[in-house]
């Protein structure tokens, strides 16, 4: 919304970061998922279990999606982990009601091996929503942008993280 952006800027707000958000109907995402099983198992985790995995990210999550926000959300969010030989190789935090993916990240050494696809597949099975949404992805994030595009999850819009210096 260009008009709203101009109003915020006229009030002294500055853009810190630009974020993309992606959406797709759940069934269309399923059609893009491989039936070839990855060499990982998907397990339920607690939000604290992903503290050691923050290095998996290619960008720092927005304040709405950071670990503190995830902890505050409590049971409204589900955290799944992908384990390869008992080692956490990736994780996904999402809302089963809304279909919003708050965070999805894979250790760079395990990328392109089906880990994120396995997490996405399990998330889709657990969500009640007919829509999958990935929100607040810093622009650009080539690895996540390409992964989502390969699964048919389309860019739906852009948002800004803004700050007002007092």
Predicted segments with their positions:
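Conserved GNAT acetyl-CoA-binding A-motif
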Residues: 19, 127-140
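Conserved acetyl-CoA pyrophosphate-binding loop and the N-cap/start of the following alpha-helix
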Residues: 110, 114-122
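A short, internal acetyl-CoA/4′-phosphopantetheine-binding micro-motif in the GNAT/acyltransferase core
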Residues: 104-112, 138
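Amide-forming acyltransferase catalytic core, primarily the GNAT-like/NAT-type
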Residues: 11-93
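Conserved active-site alpha-helix within GNAT-family acetyltransferase domains
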Residues: 1-17, 117, 138-158
């Amino acid at each position: 919304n260009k008009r709203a952006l101009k109003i915020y800027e006229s009030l002294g707000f500055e853009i810190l970061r630009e974020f993309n958000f992606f959406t797709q109907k759940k069934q269309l995402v399923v059609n893009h998922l491989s039936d070839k099983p990855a060499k990982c198992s998907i397990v339920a985790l607690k939000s604290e279990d992903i503290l050691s995995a923050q290095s998996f990210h290619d960008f720092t999550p927005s304040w709405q999606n950071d670990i503190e926000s995830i902890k505050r959300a409590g049971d409204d969010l589900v955290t799944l982990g992908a384990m390869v030989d008992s080692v956490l190789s990736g994780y996904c935090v999402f809302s089963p009601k809304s279909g919003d993916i708050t965070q999805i990240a894979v250790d760079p050494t395990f990328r392109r091996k089906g880990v994120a696809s396995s997490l996405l597949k399990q998330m889709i099975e657990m969500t009640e929503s007919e829509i999958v949404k990935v929100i607040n992805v810093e622009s650009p994030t080539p690895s996540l942008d390409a992964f989502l595009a390969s699964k048919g999850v389309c860019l739906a819009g852009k948002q800004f993280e803004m700050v007002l210096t007092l």
